[in-house]
């Protein structure tokens, strides 16, 4: 059995076909562990590195989580300089993923249109590729605080 970072791959559950020869470990969400990881990324690497990883987690790209994992391994070794290493393939890829997610977020902020239902609630239908609904909802919560909207 092989061990080490080179033998680990992160992916979202249900995204890939299951292989007969791989071992799958499903990780459940833990609020305490989440806070520790976020704090470690921000303090040991940088805020920008955290932002890159955050947007990679929102991405629909198949390799996004694995790229974030590889980026973090290098980031914890190198420190805050990792975000400036544009010749590294993992850094280039995570920056590209971040750019795509931010572009999709801005697209829905600009082009989302709401329809009024009985003058009580505004409804907008969005089908983003990435998980950007939360980011878009923050924008509209700020712009339409007195309205009821979905």
Tell me what each language-model feature is.
Residues 1-31:
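N-terminal ordered "arm"
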């Amino acid at each position: 059995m092989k061990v080490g970072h080179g033998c680990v791959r992160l992916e979202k559950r249900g995204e890939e076909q299951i292989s007969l020869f791989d071992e799958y470990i499903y990780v459940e969400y833990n609020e305490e562990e989440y806070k520790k990881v976020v704090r470690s990324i921000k303090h040991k690497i940088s805020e920008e590195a955290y932002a890159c990883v955050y947007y990679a987690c929102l991405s629909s790209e198949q390799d996004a989580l694995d790229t974030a994992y590889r980026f973090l391994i290098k980031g914890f070794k190198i420190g805050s300089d990792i975000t400036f290493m544009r010749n590294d393939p993992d850094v280039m890829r995570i920056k590209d993923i971040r750019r795509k997610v931010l572009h999709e977020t801005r697209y829905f902020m600009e082009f989302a249109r709401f329809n009024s239902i009985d003058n009580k609630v505004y409804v907008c239908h969005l089908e983003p590729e990435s998980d950007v609904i939360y980011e878009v909802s923050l924008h509209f919560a700020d712009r339409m605080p007195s309205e009821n909207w979905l």
